[in-house]
Every structure is written in C-alpha cells, then in structure tokens.
Amino acid sequence: MSFLSRFVCAVPRQAIFRTFSTLTGSSGCKYLPESTFNTIQKVSFCKKSAKGKDGDLKKKCAEAAKKEKEAAEKKKCAEAAKKEKEAAEKKKCAEAAKKEKEAAEKKKCAEAAKKEKEAAEKKKCAEAAKKEKEAAEKKKCAEAAKKEKEAAEKKKCAEAAKKEKEAAEKKKCAEAAQKKKCAELAKKEQEAAEKKKCAEAAKKEKEAAEKKKCEERAKKEKEAAEKKKCEERAKKEKEAAEKKKCAEAAKKEKEAAEKKKCAEAAQKKKCAELAKKAKEAAEKKKCAKKAGEKGSKQSGSDKGKKNGKKNDMKNKCAMLAKKAKEEALKKKCAAAQKKCEPKK
C-alpha cells in the first residue's frame, strides 16, 4: 500500500479537504500540526509514480522533524543560558549588597569606637583638670596656713618683747626707788651739807638715768620703726613676686590652651579634608561601576561575559584599593589624634 493510500485511510475526509485547500492557497487547519502542513504543501500531487512520491515525502518529513528537534533544542539551550545568566546576575547583586552592608556595619562600628574613644579622652582631660584644680587649692590653703602661722609667731614675739620691756621698766623703777630711799636715809643721817650734796648727786643721777632711759626708748622705737618698715617692704616685694609668678603661669597656661585649640582645629580640618577626598573617591567608583554595568548590558552574550569578568576584576581591585585607603586614613587620623593628646 502506498503512502497516499495509507494517508487517505488514516486521515478523515474533512482533514484531506482542508489539506488541499491549504495547498491551493486557503488558510487554516484544525487537525494536523503546522509543520506537517508545511511539509505536505511541498508535496506534489501530480500523477507520478507512487514509489517516488513515497520516498520524497518520507525524506521531507524526516528533514522537517530534524529541524523541529534542532529548533526545540536551541530554544531549550537559550532558555537554560538565560536562566543561568539571570542566576549569575542575582548572585552578583546579592554579593554586592552583602559587601555594601558589611562596609556600612564596619563604618558604623568605627564611628562608635571613635565616639567612645573621644568620650574617654574627654573624661581623662576632665579628671586631669580636676586634679590640677585640687592641687592648686591645696597649695593655696597651705600658703594661707603658713602665713597665719608666721603672723601668730610674730605676734607672740611682739608680746614677749613687750613683757620684757615692761619688766625692765619695773626693774628700773625699783632701782630708782631704792636709790631715792637711800638718798633719803643719807639725807637724814648726814647734816645739811651732806644733804645738799646728796640731793645734788641724786638729782644728777636722776637726770642721767632719765636721759639714758629716754635715749634707750628712742633707740628702741627707731629700731622698731625700721624693723616694721623692712618687714613691710619685704612683704610687698614677696607679694609682687607672687603676683608676677601667677601672671606668668596664667600667661603660659593661656598660650598652651591657644596652641592646643589651634592644633585641634588644624587636625579637625585635616580629617575633614581626608573624609571629603574619600567620599569623592567612593562617588567616582560608584559612577564607574554604573557605567560598567550599563556597557555590559548593551553588549552581546559572549562580549557580556568577558566584560562581566573584567568588571568583576575591576570591582575587586577597587574594593581592595578602597580598603587600603581606609586603613591608611584610619592610621593617619589615629596618629594625628595621638599627637593632639595632652602629654602626661
């Protein structure tokens, strides 16, 4: 049985009618696949030998089936390649997001550590200032106590000198009284001449004693006045020296504070400039990365793979350079901060 007779037996009459309608130019068929109709359209229904028709039709059907199989395999391979590409892109995006998250966490930790360090340094400076203030107050109290002690000793010495002076005066008065008593006894015992002589002698002695007493008193008063004058001069000189010393110390502290303030301002400015440069470098890197991604999307599949590898390598190099730059910046800031710290 030839292929056409088998085809007529197997296929309904309506399908055969539609097949010949397709060959004559009309469209549409609901019974056979499009590939089969494409193959049948190429078959000639002229009156030729049944064997020749059979062989050509089988060959054409085999070629059509082979082409369909190859097209299906190509479609399947293209879909698999597309899925692999999408998976690779998702993985790449996930890794980039993970790296950005890690960088943000590192930055956050570094900022927290920096704040803790600054708080510790502020606390340390406050404690040092408190200790200096307490030491200054102790020194001031010690000096005040010393001055009070010296004043008490001076007062004690003055009182002792006064008592000694009063005792000397009492002694002199007692001696004078004794002499007067002796003179009176001598006056009574002796005659009028002797009485006159004793009176004159007593008068002379009294005048000499009074003169001596006045001279001693004047001398002591002069010495006391000179001593007081010298003490006041020494006290004024001491106070002037202390004032000068305090003024110089205050001037030095003020200069040191101004120098420290200038150094801190310079360091802050330097750190701000370094941070600005790092930020600009990061922005440039981000722009370069976006440009690289855009270029890789526009290129073909093979070219995209090569560009992707190049972009990956560039990104890795940029990340390494960024990390090295951040480490150098951290070291530089730490060294500058160490220089700004007050020496113990």
UniProtKB/Swiss-Prot annotation:
Residues 74-344 are annotated as: 17 X 16 AA approximate tandem repeats of K-K-K-C-X-E-X-A-[KQ]-K-X-X-E-X-A-X. Sequence repeats lie at residues 74-89, 90-105, 106-121, 122-137, 138-153, 154-169, 170-185, 186-201, 202-217, 218-233, 234-249, 250-265, 266-281, 282-297, 298-313, 314-329, 330-344. Keywords: Cytoplasm, Repeat. Its main location: cytoplasm. It is found in: Cytoplasm. The keyword Hydrolase does not apply. Testis. Located in spermatocytes and spermatid bundles. It comes from the Eukaryota. Residues 206-244, 285-318 are annotated as: Disordered. One of its GO terms (biological process) is sperm axoneme assembly. One of its GO terms (cellular component) is cytoplasm. Residues 285-315 have a biased composition (Basic and acidic residues). The keyword Repeat applies. Possible structural role in the sperm tail. It is associated with axonemal structures. The predominant structure is alpha-helical. This is Axoneme-associated protein mst101(1). The gene is mst101(1).
